[in-house]
Curated annotation (Swiss-Prot):
Gene (name only): truA
Chain's role: Formation of pseudouridine at positions 38, 39 and 40 in the anticodon stem and loop of transfer RNAs.
Lineage: Bacteria, Bacillati, Cyanobacteriota, Cyanophyceae, Synechococcales
Entry keyword Isomerase: yes
Protein name: tRNA pseudouridine synthase A
CDD domains: PseudoU_synth_EcTruA (cd02570)
Gene Ontology terms: biological process: tRNA pseudouridine synthesis
Pfam families assigned: PseudoU_synth_1
Species in which this protein is naturally found: Prochlorococcus marinus (strain AS9601)
Length: 268
């Protein structure tokens, strides 16, 4: 028996998220079926982050235990021959039995992409939110967001239906920047609440459009005014960039060669 880790990229447009659900098309379901074809028995998979319906991943991390003669570094090629073009295994490696895709991660990184141009761009439409009511003030958005860094109770940024015992988590870093017409919101945290990033982005857009002040934004989450947090950004603009570990087991995760070109920092 060996433990194998996968670095996975997927277009979540037509999937109901990562986690298996009854009568739903999910990433985990497709991957598990591919593993079943290889081994002829059920293999349990674990992910660094549970992406929701319509959310993408450029560097999702998954592991599973398997009793098979196939070398750990060969699973990428074997699985890619069985998976649809919307799911790609970028790298596969054998890891220690104690290593866990979810619990060994120091933090996770999500990026939200807003297309703030006057006109939609069909070439990036499935991976960004076209939002143009006015030019967004990304500096105002950044300043408003910075107070969220550190460990806080983000109850206001949690959708109903979560089974977490509490809403406290630690944001390691948050950044908002403009690359031409794209606004990139990057959040790195030890963990994320259900719907957290999309709710944060929805509120930050209101700040950028000067519909609410940074002070109102802060008041809403600090004082847990969940009923005032109604705007959730569409799923298609959200991407799970990667999970970061103290012991990095992958080679490709050290750089951005697996990240969509139009989302790379500084691209113009």
């Amino acid at each position: 028996m060996k433990r194998v880790a996968l670095l996975v990229q997927y277009d979540g447009s037509h999937y109901s998220g990562w986690q298996k659900q009854k009568n739903a098309n999910t990433i985990q379901e497709i991957l598990d079926k591919a593993l079943l074809k290889i081994t002829n028995h059920t293999v349990k998979t674990f992910a660094a982050g549970r992406t929701d319906a319509g959310v993408h991943a450029s560097g999702q991390v998954i592991h599973f235990d398997i009793d098979c003669v196939i070398p750990g570094n060969s699973y990428s090629d074997v699985l890619n021959s069985l998976l649809p073009s919307t799911i790609r295994i970028l790298e596969s490696v054998e890891v220690k039995d104690s290593w866990h895709a979810c619990y060994s991660a120091s933090y996770r990184h999500y990026r939200y992409v807003i297309n703030n141009s006057k006109f939609p761009n069909l070439f990036i439409n499935n991976w960004s939110w076209h939002r143009y009511q006015k030019v967004l003030d990304e500096v105002l958005m950044l300043n408003a967001s910075k107070k969220m860094e550190g460990e806080h109770d983000f109850f206001a940024f949690q959708k109903s239906g979560s089974n977490r015992q509490n809403s406290i988590t630690k944001i390691k870093n948050i950044d908002v920047k403009r690359v031409e017409d794209l606004i990139l919101v990057d959040i790195k945290a030890t963990g994320f609440l259900y719907g957290m990033v999309r709710l944060i982005v929805g509120q930050l857009v209101l700040v950028g459009e000067k519909k609410i002040s940074p002070e109102i934004f802060t008041d809403r989450w600090v004082n847990k005014k969940k009923n005032d947090v109604k705007e959730s950004a569409p799923a298609k603009g959200l991407c799970f960039v990667n999970a970061v570990y103290e012991e990095n087991v992958f080679k490709k995760i050290k750089n951005n060669d697996f990240f969509p070109i139009f989302l790379i920092e500084g691209f113009s």
